[in-house]
UniProtKB/Swiss-Prot annotation:
NCBIfam families: PRK13290.1 (NF009806). Its EC number is 4.2.1.108. It comes from Phenylobacterium zucineum (strain HLK1). Keywords: Lyase. Coiled coil: none annotated. Gene3D superfamilies: Jelly Rolls. One of its GO terms (biological process) is ectoine biosynthetic process. PANTHER family: L-ECTOINE SYNTHASE (PTHR39289:SF1), PTHR39289. Belongs to the ectoine synthase family. This is L-ectoine synthase. InterPro entries: Ectoine_synth, RmlC-like_jellyroll, RmlC_Cupin_sf. It catalyses: (2S)-4-acetamido-2-aminobutanoate = L-ectoine + H2O. The keyword Lyase applies.
Length: 130
């Protein structure tokens, strides 16, 4: 059994801070769950173009408001508490925080914890990081 406290994990290298967001990775690849699980904060006013070419992601909004734009269709979906979106086709998107948003995120394959977004907004595969 794995038990982790978010407030404790935030004080470790599981917390990653970047421009427009921060994320605490509560489950990582080494936990052998088949996915990683993160609590991510999107800062108010952030506009984050992303394209997870190597990962699928599901995101549930806990608090805050914003939007996600599907760059293939131009469709914009509102995000608010209780809304989930799933990037099931490696969707190119822009995430915008109208207010600070707290999100619960699951990634498959799981991240290792060392990833940073590349110039296209993607996380590389672990093999590409070696």
């Amino acid at each position: 059994m794995i038990v982790r406290d978010l407030s404790q994990a935030e004080k470790t290298d599981r917390r990653v801070v970047s421009k427009g967001w921060e994320s605490t990775r509560l489950l990582l690849k080494d936990d052998a769950m088949g996915f990683s699980f993160h609590i991510t904060t999107i800062y108010e006013g952030a506009e984050l173009p992303m394209h997870y070419k190597n990962h699928l992601e599901a995101v549930y909004c806990i608090s805050g408001e914003g939007s996600i734009e599907d760059l293939a269709t131009g469709q914009v979906h509102e995000i608010r508490p209780g809304v989930l979106y799933a990037l099931d086709k490696h969707d190119r998107h822009v995430l915008r925080g109208r207010t600070q948003m707290v999100m619960a995120c699951a990634f498959n394959p799981p991240v290792t914890g060392r990833e940073v977004h590349d110039e296209t907004g993607a996380y590389p595969l672990e093999a590409e990081m070696a």
